[in-house]
Each structure stands twice: as structure tokens, then as C-alpha cells.
Swiss-Prot record:
InterPro entries cross-referenced by the UniProt entry: INP2
Protein name, entry field: Inheritance of peroxisomes protein 2
Residues with glycosylation annotation: N275, N343, N344, N379, N517, N569, N574
Keywords: Glycoprotein, Membrane, Peroxisome, Receptor, Transmembrane, Transmembrane helix
Example GO BP: peroxisome inheritance
Subunit structure of this chain's protein: Interacts with MYO2.
Length: 705
């Protein structure tokens, strides 16, 4: 190596790269070259270029710009280590091989993946969709973050626009394209270099006799240099891919949040215009209809485009997910697998259904990203979830079988390419929504009187309700049906499970009393709860035979009979009681004088039978007294109701007759207009409770005329 000439490209030190990659880059990471931005790379200006190259020969004279920092991609997770050219002093006769080898293998290329995946999961969990309440309070700030791969520093402004030869660095060969992008080409394959080095060292150990020969040291040093370069290039490549993956995920989450906010605003505006057109009558109603149609078209376009895009990329993401973890995340974030199946396989036409299925699919995509398989252990997969995914996505099992072996970096590369297409669609949808933003502020804001929630709860039953429990049984049957592996057919075990669930549901439905609960929740007549005037209904716990017959007879009910010795006086007493009740019913509508005579006769007859009642026991006397009081109270109440109803309908007929005279209706028209054209026996509204409705109908007919 000469000291009076500039070192060649092969002797250039490793560049310290801290770059923000452009999201519009089309080249993949597995292509022939790696792409970086040139705006944010620490470089060397003309003033310090000579110093930069001279420090390669004198490591102790390295400037502060060439020293690696804690955010360098080569030392993430290691603060006490800096990489510099390995030199051996001239006076050093023996040096420690263990120290050199430990420094070479200190950075494992695979260690960055686990650190990245924790930050990757944290970014998704704290997103707008999975943590709506506290996502702005849970930002992650780490000293050793994957995002520290890029740090703004001195710009490389003097990079030539074209560089024909590649410059060799420890991260690969560097070249500059016309669009100011930096391309890195990996020239040391990590696995092949490790295997080749291991074979060479094995052969040296087998055939080399002199362990301290200078030739052996030179060969070993060359092997260690090659291993070191392969480790650095693989580490840089993995760190770069993880950085771009996390960057793309954050951009997609931000775009999803912006699109979701705009869709929510348009949906609210659409509801306001629709409600305003029904509530108020304004002159701008034609403009409102026009704007509502535009908003509906925007919402349908946005929801359909995003839904079908997610539907196309989710099958490519879910094959990399661990089904057991995916099942846990779906349960945690309230994603119902049968509901996902119905929304993914059926056609939805209404706007609310389109927005709901889009929201459901977005959450499912994030759950798929959270459950990416980082262990490569497929033995712990959830069989039920796998069968359900095979029904939701018909080619799921075929894709899983064609998938390559466990390779997390390859998985992240595929995810970045899928998210890049989704991000471009989100940008297009967001531009379209922003172009029509003036519709959101076209009218003055109306104050909404409806303070209820936007969407009524579909199932308003409590957990203790029988119907709610029956729906839970049906949901369990749906989950069992989706968990059946259709490739092997329906086995006897699956059939028995479904039949047992159905039998449990049928048994539960038969034993429940849902119909009884519904029948009890009926409107009670005001005459049964509100009693005007004096009445004798003092024993509400007991019911008379006449009132019990109205509710229906129960032939299965047991009746207790009391054995009483019947005599001639008892039979005579029963006959006279029946005659008294019939006499009382006939004379209730007569004058007060006849009632007084009836009372006198009644008292007189009772006075004749006073000695007969002394022969009865206390219980028999109490029972007879209760029956008589209940009978009198029931007859009194029914008589008052009949009288009140007759008077009310008489007043109604008089009012109808006066209106017919006032408006001059002819006989046929009057027969069609009023209810007196039909007899009351044919009228469905013949109770006292329906009279207010008849008055309202009369008022409406009068207003329309």
C-alpha cells in the first residue's frame, strides 16, 4: 500500500449510511441493488475528503465525522463497540485471536429482527383502529430504535451525478444513479460465505502442521475479513428492510386514519342532509339532494375500492400469520369470524353495510400483521381457525403449501410490497375525498335534536334474557360449522358435535318461557288500575268465578273440594241465593224505589235464615261472605263500565250528527265518513279506550275537508 497516492476504490473505508428511503421507490430489496436516498447520507465534502482517505491508514487520527455513533446501523444494541479497521502493530509479535473473533461476531445479523418486531407490534397496537381512546398518549420513544437508522446530518451535496464504477464499501458496492439515488449491491452472500469459511478452516486444521506459520495467519485473516464483510452486509440489509417495513407500516396507518376520518365526516354529513330533508322544508332541498347523491357516490366508491383492495392483499398476508395468535387477536379486538365470513362472501348493497364490512376488514388486516409468525413453529397452529380461513379465502391452504420456509426478512419484503400498493390507493382515495371537501360546509350547521347514538343496538336484550342466550347458542353452532375441515368431509365426530348443540338449543328453547314473558308485557286496561267512585273490590287476591272465566280455563289445574254435609236448609239457601242474584241483576237498571224494596226483601229473607248460618263453620261462613262480596263488586264494576261506555258513545254520535248537519253531508257520504254507518257489533273499536282515537280521526277528517 503506497502512502503518496490516493487509495483506490477497493481500499475505501466503509460508509456510515443514515438515510430516509423514498416511499415512491419501485425497486425491491431483493433485486440486484439496494436503493437509498442521497439527501440524508453522511458524506465527505471536498474540504475533508483528503482527511477522510488519510484516516484509513491511521485509525487513531479519525475525525469526529467518521466515528460511528450509537444510532449507526452497525452498532444498534451495542454502545461500547465501534468498528474500525483491524490493525496489527509492527512491534506486536503475538496477538489475541479470541478478541478479534469476538469483535467480528459481536453483531449477529438476526438479532435486529426481534427488536424490530416488538416495535412493529407496538406501532400497530397503538394505532387509531385498535386503540381509539389513547393512541395519542402511547407514543414509543426508544434510545435504540429501528427508526434511528436515519439521522439528519451533513448532506452529501458533492456526490457526482453519475458514477460509472461501483465504490466498494463494507455494506456492498455503492453507485449513484441519475435521479440522485444511491444503490447498494451486496457482493458477499452471508450463508455461502459462512459455509465456505467453515470448510476452509476445517481443511486448514486438518492439513496444516505449523499452527503459527505466517502463511496460515494470512489465510485466517483473509477468511475473517470476508466473514466480517458478509456479516456487515447482511446486518445492513436486514436493518434496512426492517427500517423500511416499519416506515411503510406507519405511513399506511397514518393514511388509513386520515381516510377513516374523512369517510366518517362524509357519512355524518350524509345523515344530516337526509334528516334535514325530512324535518324541514327549505328552498335548498334540490341542492341538498344533489349533494347527498355526490356524498353517497364518494362513500360507495371509497368503501368498495378499499374493501376489494384489502380483500386482495389479505390472503397474501394471512399465510404468514400464526393461526393461534390470530385467533387470540380476533377475540381480543372483537372480530367475529362468522361475521367476517358473511361480509366477505355475500354482496352488500346498502351504504351502512359497506362501511361496516370495510371497518371489519381493516381490523382483521391489522390482526394479521400482529400475528406474523416469528418462530417458524407450525405445530402450534389453531386447526379451527385454519379451517375457517380456508372457507373465507378458498385458496388459503394452497398458498400455505406453496409458501417458502421460515424467512422473516422475506416475509417483511413481501409485506412492504403489499402495503406499497395499499398506500398508493389510500393516497388516491384521500385526494378524491379532499377535492370534494366543500360539500361538508355547503349548508349552515343544523342543531340535531337527536342525542341518541348513531347506530341503534341491534340486540337490546340483557344477558339474562332467554332470547339472548338462544342467540349465543346459534353463534356457537356457527363457529363449529366453520371449524369443520371440508377437505376430509364431515366426520362422525363433527356430526355428533353439531347434533348435540342443536339438541341443547331445542331443549333450552322448549323449557324457556319467552312467550309467557312477552304476553305479560301488555298494556293493562285503565279500568283495572284506576277505579273512580266507590267500589267493593277489597279482596284483590281472590277472584270471582266470572272474572276467572274471562282469562280462560285451565283443565290441568287441580281443584280442592271441601266436603260439607248438605242438608235441606243448605239446598234451600243456595236456591234462594241464585234467585236473589237474578233479581238483583234485573232490578239494577230500575228506579231507586224498587232497589229499596229489593233491599227490604233481601234483608227480610236473610232474617229468616239467620238460624241456618249458625250451623256452618267459620271457614264456610268466611268463604260464602267472600264470594258474595266479590260477586257484588264485579257486578257493580261491570254495570258502571257499561253505563260509562254507553254515555261516551252517545256523546260521540251526537257530535258526529252535528258535524254532518254543519258540513251538509249527504246520506251515502255520511255513511262512509262516520262510524255510525256500521253497527257497533261490527266495529273493531268499541271499547272506552278507543274513544280518543275516534276523536282524533274525526278531527283529521274535519281538517282535510
Amino acid at each position: 500500500m503506497t502512502t503518496n497516492s490516493r487509495p483506490s476504490a477497493l481500499q475505501a473505508p466503509g460508509l456510515q449510511i443514515f438515510s430516509m428511503l423514498k416511499s415512491s421507490e419501485e425497486d425491491g430489496f431483493m433485486s440486484s441493488s439496494l436503493t437509498l436516498d442521497s439527501d440524508n447520507i453522511i458524506g465527505v465534502t471536498e474540504n475533508n475528503r483528503q482527511e477522510f482517505y488519510s484516516t484509513w491508514r491511521k485509525p487513531s487520527l479519525l475525525s469526529s465525522r467518521s466515528v460511528l455513533h450509537e444510532y449507526s446501523p452497525t452498532i444498534v444494541g451495542s454502545n461500547d463497540c465501534t468498528f474500525s479497521p483491524i490493525t496489527v502493530g509492527k512491534t506486536t509479535k503475538f496477538f489475541n485471536w479470541d478478541d478479534i473473533i469476538s469483535r467480528i461476531f459481536m453483531q449477529q445479523p438476526f438479532g435486529v429482527t426481534h427488536q424490530f418486531f416488538e416495535e412493529f407490534r407496538y406501532s400497530i397496537i397503538t394505532s387509531h383502529f385498535l386503540n381509539d381512546m389513547n393512541h395519542y398518549r402511547l407514543s414509543l420513544h426508544l434510545d435504540q430504535s429501528i427508526m434511528n437508522f436515519h439521522k439528519s446530518s451533513t448532506l452529501l451535496k458533492n456526490v457526482p451525478p453519475k458514477s460509472v464504477p461501483f465504490m466498494a464499501t463494507k455494506y456492498g458496492k455503492l453507485a449513484v444513479a441519475e435521479d440522485k439515488k444511491l444503490y447498494f449491491r451486496q457482493n458477499f452472500n452471508y450463508l455461502s460465505m459462512i459455509i465456505t469459511s467453515y470448510r476452509v478452516l476445517t481443511q486448514l486444521k486438518k492439513y496444516c502442521r505449523k499452527k503459527n506459520s505466517p502463511g496460515l495467519k494470512r489465510v485466517v485473516i483473509l477468511i475473517l475479513v470476508a466473514v466480517y464483510l458478509s456479516i456487515q452486509q447482511e446486518y445492513f440489509r436486514r436493518h434496512l428492510i426492517c427500517y423500511k417495513t416499519l416506515l411503510k407500516v406507519r405511513k399506511v396507518l397514518e393514511s388509513l386514519q386520515q381516510v377513516d376520518v374523512m369517510i366518517h365526516k362524509y357519512h355524518l354529513r350524509f345523515k344530516e342532509i337526509k334528516n334535514h330533508s325530512f324535518i324541514s322544508r327549505v328552498s335548498l332541498i334540490s341542492i341538498a339532494d344533489e349533494h347527498s347523491s355526490v356524498i353517497k357516490e364518494l362513500l360507495v366508491f371509497s368503501s368498495d375500492a378499499l374493501f376489494y383492495k384489502l380483500k386482495s392483499i389479505i390472503p397474501d398476508i394471512v399465510i404468514f400469520s400464526d393461526t393461534s395468535e390470530l385467533s387470540k387477536y380476533c377475540e381480543l379486538y372483537g372480530i367475529d369470524v362468522p361475521n367476517l365470513y358473511y361480509n366477505n362472501t355475500t354482496t352488500v348493497k346498502d351504504l351502512d353495510g359497506k362501511l361496516y364490512r370495510l371497518k371489519l376488514l381493516k381490523k382483521f388486516m391489522l390482526c394479521c400483521l400482529l400475528s406474523l409468525d416469528m418462530t417458524g413453529n407450525e405445530n402450534l397452529s389453531n386447526v379451527n381457525m385454519r379451517n375457517a380461513l380456508n372457507k373465507i379465502f378458498p385458496d388459503y391452504m394452497a398458498r400455505v403449501q406453496l409458501k417458502k420456509k421460515y424467512n422473516p426478512i422475506g416475509t417483511f419484503q413481501n409485506i412492504v410490497s403489499l402495503l406499497r400498493g395499499l398506500h398508493s390507493l389510500l393516497s388516491t382515495v384521500l385526494v378524491s375525498l379532499n377535492d370534494h371537501k366543500q360539500i361538508l360546509y355547503a349548508f349552515p350547521e343544523e342543531t340535531s335534536t337527536n342525542t341518541g347514538c348513531e347506530r341503534a343496538n341491534v340486540c337490546s336484550f340483557s344477558k339474562n334474557d332467554k332470547l339472548f342466550q338462544a342467540l349465543n347458542y346459534l353463534k356457537m353452532i356457527e363457529n363449529n360449522l366453520l371449524a369443520i375441515d371440508i377437505r376430509n368431509g364431515i366426520t362422525e365426530n363433527d356430526r355428533n358435535i353439531i347434533e348435540d348443540k342443536l339438541e341443547e338449543l331445542i331443549t333450552f328453547w322448549k323449557t324457556s318461557k319467552i312467550c309467557g314473558n312477552i304476553s305479560r308485557i301488555q298494556k293493562v286496561s285503565p279500568t283495572n288500575t284506576i277505579n273512580h267512585g266507590f267500589h267493593l273490590d277489597i279482596l284483590k287476591g281472590r277472584k270471582s268465578p266470572r272474572s276467572s272465566s274471562v282469562q280462560g280455563l285451565s283443565l290441568e289445574r287441580k281443584v280442592d273440594f271441601i266436603d260439607v254435609a248438605e242438608s235441606v236448609n243448605d239446598s234451600f239457601e243456595n236456591d234462594t241465593e241464585l234467585e236473589e242474584y237474578e233479581d238483583y241483576d234485573c232490578q239494577e237498571e230500575c228506579s231507586a224505589g224498587s232497589r229499596q224494596n229489593h233491599r227490604v226483601d233481601f234483608i227480610g229473607k236473610d232474617s229468616c235464615r239467620k238460624p241456618d248460618f249458625k250451623q256452618l263453620s267459620d271457614n264456610e261462613l268466611r268463604r260464602k261472605l267472600d264470594e258474595r262480596i266479590l260477586k257484588l263488586a264485579q257486578e257493580n264494576r261491570e254495570g258502571r263500565e257499561r253505563l260509562r261506555t254507553a254515555k261516551s258513545f252517545e256523546l260521540l254520535r251526537k257530535a258526529q250528527a252535528s258535524m254532518s248537519v254543519k258540513f251538509g253531508f249527504q246520506k251515502p257520504l255520511r255513511d262512509d265518513a262516520f262510524l255510525e254507518s256500521r253497527p257497533l257489533s261490527k266495529c273493531k273499536v268499541s271499547s272506552e279506550e278507543t274513544i280518543p282515537f275516534l276523536y282524533e280521526l274525526k278531527g283529521l277528517l274535519g281538517n282535510d275537508s
